[in-house]
Amino acid sequence: MGMVFSRFKKCRSKISFLGIISGFLAIVFLTISKASIWFDEAFSAYIIRFNFAEIWHYTSVDVHPPLYYFLLKIWSAFFGSSDFALRSLSAFFGVLTIILAYFLVKRIYNKKIALLASSFLAISPMLIRYSQEARMYTMVAFLSILTVRAFHEAWVAENTMKNKKKWRIIYIIAVCAGIWTQYLYALIPISLWIFRAVYISKNQEKNNRFHLFSCLKFQKQKNSVRQFFSNFFAEKWLSSHLIVAFLYIPWIPFFISQATYVKAKFWIPALDFTTIPNMISNFFFYLDAGKTNGWLSLIAMAILLIIVIFTFEKWRSEKNNSIFWLIFSVSVIPIFLLYIASLPPFSSIFVDRYLLMAEVFVSILMAIIAVKLFENKKSVSILFIVLIIFSHIFGIFQLNLQKGISKNGGEITEIRQAIEKVRNEKNNAAIAVGGFLYYSAAQYSNNESKIWFYGEPPIYRSGDMIRADYTPKIENDSSFLKNKEFFIISPYNSADKESPISDYNFSEEMDYNNSLNGDPLYKILKFIKK
């Protein structure tokens, strides 16, 4: 019996970690198919219908690089293109993010902090939410963790030259994959550049009384400056990034085109006083700050206060604690830089989900603080952990309540449910949908009940796929006229009872009310052939 207990004790951390992963998977997959796909997911689902060259083209006129779409197409070849299948790729990267975070923290700290960090990530409302969405955010989070691990092994930790070389290669691959997946991933390597500059400056200051910021004041320390830059670009730091830049050359013309387009036309609202509070509130509770009550606000402020006080004390007592400041850098600097880059005269690009890569490091940072506090302030540490767990569990319940609600202005998408309502009336109904809503509806087209496009395609470049001949359009396809009747589903306030085809007359209408608050969401119009 003692031997069994001893073995169990040795395997306890492994069992705990498997329990954490299992819990995360249960939470994610329990409701992964509950919501109808919304526009961003629908764009992902639609673009993978094309070949790789066409995906490259249609991505180039949108706002993201193509790597995620390439992977999603390959994934769909094995697992299908249902909502469940497409979202499962994000769940896969969500799990990998937690696993990689565990091994990163175990390497730089210890097993106890690694388990707590994994636990925080497993119940993180934001990580759960975007592990259920057919978009690239969890893939970027995974690549960000991999990048930081590779950076640490290649340029911070004591390692053999062979290991350093291996991790430099992994770093190059991770950074390449990241910037070919989402542009804002670049905030992670930029944060590492800043950390490395300060890290080398501090080491040089310790040895030679060199101050990086005194150089910026143009003091005469030419030898020290030369030494700083020599150390900074040493260990193949510069050459590694030159390789990354070289491998990115094929996409640079498209990046420039997209950047110009985003500056001229983009949907993201300008920054205001609620931007940061909303980001913080969504991280903890998956709820905008304006919708929280006094108690939730108090919980968030208490957590933030503990983080700020601990960080300040850390700065005062251990100025050269590189590992803590590495995690702090990739937690905070991306948020700060994205905020600055979104200020006028630039177009705002500040969206919570774009910062998921930084938020996973915030969870790691909180785990580090919690365990370190436990060493001499147990009651504060326990309170800190309890508040985080409570906030995240509350956020998970909010996730379930808000299924089908986009964070883009609270837009509700239940097009799958509306289509099911039509098919309940007529099993093999021909259904027409216009505008960008077509992308979401097309996901639910089948051979018995086809989804068609009607009207003028959207003027934005993301509507180019609709303009393609691939898209079935009722005005251009004579086979559509074989239908004795058809249905149009449109947003409730933009329904038009005039038939888009002269061969049909309006017959009747139905309302589809959303399942969240009962308000009218879509108008369903029935047309019968003359």
Model-inferred region functions:
Residues 14-158, 165-203, 212, 225-528:
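Membrane-proximal helix-loop-helix interfaces that form the catalytic/acceptor-binding platform
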Residues 2, 205-206, 216, 221-223:
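Targeting/processing segments of secretory and organellar proteins
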